[in-house]
């Protein structure tokens, strides 16, 4: 069983330290994981499906397989549905541009979901649909509150439904480094989680990132806390996707490490790892020894 990926790592968008936990748990499942590699051809033969590969460095190889699964994303169908015949502007790639009310360039036509752009996620599309429906209903009913609805989500969580699951939301550590954003990291290993140990699945990790810029924590009720608001977070472990919503809410509400750490989480649960990670960032966690200076 081989996995072929054109990019330099699996699960692009997630921090590499989270993905490495998944890789460690699953390396026995695969014969090869070929990174920086393109699939350039495939032919059916009596022996099986013969596939040709080419590395980004020009190296060529091939393999023969019983089955091949091609998973390369989706293409917007704005041109195929002939939206332009209704006057709707469609981009060269097939996307349809909308404003924050999900309205196209034609005032009475709305669009939501994958066709309006990334990220192509069902939970994003649902919220976009709510906005469009409220705006339409508000205008028909003369309800100004409904008619003023807008899609203004600060963050949209992502989940890789693997085993273990990988989930992340907001700013990632890799993005923070690339953008020169100083962050305070709180990392809680599930090896210190009673529930994870009892489940026999303590390989997981919960990570939270807080604003650690010089001006962080100077206002908005965060003065004297030594850090600013939460900017992002990620988890790898069983049911990570079920818990990432709490981190998304914390970002939307502008919470800091004290807010999250002092929120009482039920014990023993995997979800309390979020509170523990906040305590690690704040330096008040008694479940994990402080890092040596």
Name each model feature, range by range.
Residues 2, 108-111, 204, 229-231:
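Protein kinase-like catalytic core scaffold
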Residues 2-100, 171, 178-183, 191, ...:
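A Rossmann-like FAD-binding core segment of flavoenzymes
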Residues 14-21, 25, 106, 112-178, ...:
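A conserved FAD-binding loop/helix module that cradles the flavin
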Residues 16, 45, 110, 235-236:
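Residue-level structural signal for beta-strand termini and adjacent loop
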Residues 28, 63, 104-107, 154, ...:
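Structured loop/turn residues at beta-strand edges in well-structured enzyme cores
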Residues 44-49, 106, 199-204:
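A short, glycine/Asx- and small/polar-enriched loop/turn
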Residues 156, 161-293:
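Flexible, glycine-rich terminal cap/loop adjacent to redox cofactors
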């Amino acid at each position: 069983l081989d996995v072929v990926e054109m990019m330099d790592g699996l699960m692009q968008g997630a921090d590499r330290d989270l993905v490495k936990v998944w890789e460690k748990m699953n390396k026995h499942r695969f014969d090869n994981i070929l990174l920086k590699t393109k699939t350039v051809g495939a032919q059916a033969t009596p022996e099986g499906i013969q596939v040709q590969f080419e590395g980004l460095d020009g190296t060529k190889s091939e393999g023969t397989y019983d089955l091949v699964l091609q998973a390369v994303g989706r293409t917007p169908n704005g041109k195929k549905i002939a939206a332009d015949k209704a006057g709707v502007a469609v981009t060269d790639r097939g996307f349809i541009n909308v404003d924050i009310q999900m309205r196209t360039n034609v005032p009475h036509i709305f669009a939501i979901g994958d066709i309006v752009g990334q990220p192509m996620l069902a939970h994003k599309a649902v919220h976009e649909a709510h906005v469009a429906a409220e705006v339409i209903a508000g205008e028909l009913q003369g309800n100004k509150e409904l008619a003023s609805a807008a899609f203004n989500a600060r963050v949209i969580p992502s989940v890789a439904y693997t085993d273990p699951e990988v989930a992340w939301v907001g700013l990632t550590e890799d993005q923070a480094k690339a953008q020169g954003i100083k962050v305070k990291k709180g990392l809680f290993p599930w090896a210190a989680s009673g529930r994870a140990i009892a489940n026999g699945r303590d390989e997981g990790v919960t990570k939270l990132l807080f604003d650690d810029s010089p001006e962080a924590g100077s206002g908005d009720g965060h003065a004297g806390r030594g850090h600013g608001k939460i900017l992002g977070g990620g988890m790898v472990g069983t049911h990570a996707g079920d818990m990432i919503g709490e981190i998304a809410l914390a970002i939307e509400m502008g919470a800091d490490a004290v807010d999250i750490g002092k929120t009482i989480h039920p014990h023993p649960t995997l979800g309390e790892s979020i509170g523990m990670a906040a305590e690690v960032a704040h330096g008040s966690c008694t479940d994990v020894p402080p890092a040596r200076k």
